[in-house]
Amino acid sequence: MTGEVKAAFVFMMAGTLSALLLAVFVMFSQESPEAAVLSGKKEKLKESLEMVKYESVSIYYAEEDRPILELTKETLRDAAVMNRELFASPLQDSVDLIFFSNRNDMESFSKLKDITGFYSNNMRMIGLLPEERTHLNSGEGFAVFLYKRVLVHEYTHYAFHVKLRELNADPAAYPLWFHEGVAEWASAHDAIEIRTLPSVVPLSKLKTDRQWQKARTGYETDIYLQSYYLIEELAEKKGRGVILDIIEETAERGSFADGFKAAVGQSLTGFEKEFKRKYEAKKTAWKVSSFRAVFIINE
């Protein structure tokens, strides 16, 4: 498909982090014949759904999704408050939020496989597949937690691109790990991440979609978690304002490496080396603690 595709994988379990896999994609592309076709499909899809406005978001839904409208509005409200502060933007650009009724419809529309949500910058839309509707409708904690996390992730991609338009900046100037890391961090920064990275993928191999897709299968690690931890590390070092600083400095200089150094006061290469040392040490500590736990249990 034309343009770049970004993916984020979230592993969560009610109250803890575990092995449940959830995939969400983000697309941004230039105008193309294929984009025009998708835009036409989007308008046709909207005609078949009901619509309700919430601030700058037009929510398109079928009757079966009416019970989750209040949860959706609540999540959008929280996401907007956080992202307005994060990006220093009123976030007034309109965006469509469209619920898909099943996986086949979503995959047919997006031409993407195994997804539960996506954001298209070209079409200015968020697509969501509310899984486990019965559990969502009943307010079950785990289902609600997952739904809110995915929606916040996608909304953050929308907010990021709004800011880039304000700055007249090219989204492709920012490496994929930064796009995904910011969205993952926004959706999970208030959670406690306790998972250890098996290994750290070089950032030079996480810039483009092609590299990202290759890294998914070429490394025995979680590149989505790595991107989250990279942003978390930056926020701990410099405060959450460093995210906007990097975005603005990169827009001004036209180079992510130059913008990063200006905002962080450290070269990207130096930060990467420091990050790798830290997480290699954490991995070693985790292995030692796991061995001791097993040894004690087996005594």
Show which residues each predicted segment covers.
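Juxtacatalytic substrate-recognition/specificity segment
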Residues: 45-167, 256
